Amino acid sequence: MQFSKMHGLGNDFMVVDAVTQNVYFSPELIRRLADRHTGVGFDQMLVVEPPYDPELDFHYRIFNADGSEVSQCGNGARCFARFVRLKGLTNKRDISVSTQTGRMILSVTEDELVCVNMGEPNFEPQSVPFRAAKAEKTYILRAAEHTVLCGVVSMGNPHCVMQVDDVSVANVALLGPVLESHERFPERANIGFMQVVSREHIRLRVYERGAGETQACGSGACAAVAVGIQQELLGEEVHVELPGGSLHISWKGPGHPLYMTGPATHVYDGFIHL
């Protein structure tokens, strides 16, 4: 099977063309391939499939390193767009894809950055999903003997975002896994630790559902900005600084889609016998 290794700001992927190849991945096989000592090694596997809807260009599937399938990965979406162009599957600059939960437009710029229309952030608890009687701007969660004030949003996948004074010393290793599997998130969640530098600049670390802390999380950056704007902490255009690099997030507020712009890097092509 042919594949490519790619990354978006250090969030790394094994990308597989299932348009021209017949492939099947069990959770066990994905876990073996994800192993950084004995496999290919990656945070997520991205699979390019033929479109389920003839009006679209491709279907986009995402698998975490633990073998679970998820509905959204923003950094992966940028790599997906670069991959289908590099492999000659399309020459379009505006690429339409479906996911488990919706549709996206991926736009490749002249300087090969990728702008992703991530859709409108959804704060309704049942859509996240999150167990709450009604939608609030902030919720109180208790985890590992800590009381956490957070915002909750779906970007096509569930996110919990908390504000911290200094992201460099945030207790991601302790709070990340506890909040990821908190009982109020029936499908688990991605956990963002956000330091607000100014209304146009945040620093962010993300503990990803099924992958642990990564160098960057695109949907996590989108979620953090959406929550920050909802809580009136941020403006419409925000520079998001992650351990692996920076993204630009733009959102005009309710009724409008959120846009994420950033790089996608091709590392190498490979072949593996399954």
Curated annotation (Swiss-Prot):
A Pfam entry, by short name: DAP_epimerase
Keywords tagged on the record: Amino-acid biosynthesis, Cytoplasm, Isomerase, Lysine biosynthesis
Entry's Gene Ontology cellular component terms: cytosol
Entry binding sites for substrate: 11, 44, 64, 74-75, 157, 190, 208-209, 218-219
Top-level taxon of the source organism: Bacteria
Site (Important for dimerization): 268
InterPro entries: DAP_epimerase_AS, DAP_epimerase_DapF
Active-site residues, as the UniProt record annotates them: 73 (proton donor), 217 (proton acceptor)
UniProt entry tagged with the keyword Transport: no
Pathway: Amino-acid biosynthesis; L-lysine biosynthesis via DAP pathway; DL-2,6-diaminopimelate from LL-2,6-diaminopimelate: step 1/1
Catalytic reaction equation(s): (2S,6S)-2,6-diaminopimelate = meso-2,6-diaminopimelate
UniProt-listed Enzyme Commission number(s): 5.1.1.7
Subcellular localization, as worded in the UniProt entry: Cytoplasm
PROSITE patterns: DAP_EPIMERASE
A GO molecular-function annotation: diaminopimelate epimerase activity
Gene3D superfamilies: Diaminopimelate Epimerase, Chain A, domain 1 (3.10.310.10)
Sites annotated Could be important to modulate the pK values of the two catalytic cysteine residues: 159, 208
One of the GO BP terms on file: lysine biosynthetic process via diaminopimelate
PANTHER family for the chain: DIAMINOPIMELATE EPIMERASE, DIAMINOPIMELATE EPIMERASE, CHLOROPLASTIC
Function: Catalyzes the stereoinversion of LL-2,6-diaminopimelate (L,L-DAP) to meso-diaminopimelate (meso-DAP), a precursor of L-lysine and an essential component of the bacterial peptidoglycan.
Family membership: Belongs to the diaminopimelate epimerase family.
Subunit structure and binding partners: Homodimer.
Protein name: Diaminopimelate epimerase
Species annotation: Yersinia enterocolitica serotype O:8 / biotype 1B (strain NCTC 13174 / 8081)
Taxonomic placement: Bacteria, Pseudomonadati, Pseudomonadota, Gammaproteobacteria, Enterobacterales
Gene name of this polypeptide: dapF
